[in-house]
Curated annotation (Swiss-Prot):
GO biological process terms held by the UniProt record: regulation of cell cycle
PANTHER family, per the entry: CYCLIN-DEPENDENT KINASE INHIBITOR 4-RELATED
GO molecular function, one term: cyclin-dependent protein serine/threonine kinase inhibitor activity
Gene designation per UniProt: KRP2
Keywords carried by this UniProt record: Protein kinase inhibitor
Region (Disordered): 118-180
Keyword match Transferase: no
Family note: Belongs to the CDI family. ICK/KRP subfamily.
GO cellular component: nucleus
Entry keyword annotation includes Repressor: no
Biased composition (Polar residues): 161-180
Protein name: Cyclin-dependent kinase inhibitor 2
Length: 249
């Protein structure tokens, strides 16, 4: 009993030293602050896993309270998942842009095939008539595919894509028209070569006779000699030469 009383007395004396006239000492205040901050930190860590008041940063993370600010700690799994989501979005955008590009290219090739079929079906018609019809058709198609000026200002990307597609279609039409003109020119030349009959013998003789006649007249006027019959002309002719008979002996 004596020892217990001594211990109780020592505790009372220590408590009296700590609390003097209702005022706490500096050591007790510091100890209480340390305990309170530790309890508050534990509470924040417990709330971080549940996501109650942590917001977006509470998913797999917690707050570390400092003297001036709080630092959020995010788990590595959350960071990797967010990076994967961003990468997936970028891949999806690239795939959509490539698909739209492929659609534009396919549209241009289909237009070219349609123009080629139209040219093949109209191969027997006149070239001038076909050119006028093609020009009028191109004008109608160009007026139909021209983007409207009343398009809203937020649709600038789609208008640029349509203008690029229209330019590609015009290039395809020009190339197909040029190839069609060359094809028709070659076909016309081949048909003329195949349909032209050979010249008759009478036509050839008539052409050569006219040339021989003009050459005989020129020779007679200069040499006073008839090359057709092989005899000299009269002395009173227009030629400068006179012919005399020479004896054979």
């Amino acid at each position: 009993m004596g020892k217990k009383k001594k211990r109780d007395g020592a505790a009372a004396r220590r408590q009296a030293r700590v609390v003097v006239g209702g005022v706490r000492t500096r050591a007790a205040v510091t100890a209480r602050r340390v305990v309170a901050s530790a309890e508050e930190g534990c509470g924040l860590v417990g709330r971080g896993g549940g996501g109650g008041s942590g917001g977006d940063d509470g998913e797999g993370g917690c707050y570390l309270r400092l003297r001036s600010r709080r630092l959020p700690f995010v788990a590595a799994a959350v960071v990797s998942s967010r990076r994967e989501e961003a990468l997936g979005d970028s891949v999806a955008e690239a795939a959509s842009s490539s698909s739209s590009r492929a659609v534009e290219l396919l549209g241009c090739s289909g237009e070219e095939e349609a123009m080629a079929e139209k040219v093949c079906t109209q191969a027997g018609e006149d070239h001038d008539e076909e050119s006028s019809v093609g020009d009028s058709g191109c004008g109608r198609e160009r007026s139909a595919t021209t983007p409207s000026s009343r398009r809203p200002p937020g649709d600038a990307d789609s208008s640029d894509a349509e203008s690029n597609q229209e330019a590609k279609q015009q290039m395809c039409r020009r190339s197909s028209t040029t190839s069609a003109a060359a094809f028709h020119a070659g076909a016309t030349t081949r048909s003329f070569r195949m349909m032209a009959p050979p010249a008759a013998a009478a036509e050839i003789e008539e052409f050569l006779a006219a040339a021989e006649r003009s050459e005989a007249e020129r020779f007679a006027a200069k040499y006073n000699f008839d090359v057709v019959r092989g005899v000299p002309l009269d002395a009173g002719g227009a030629g400068r030469f006179e012919w005399t008979a020479v004896g054979s002996g």
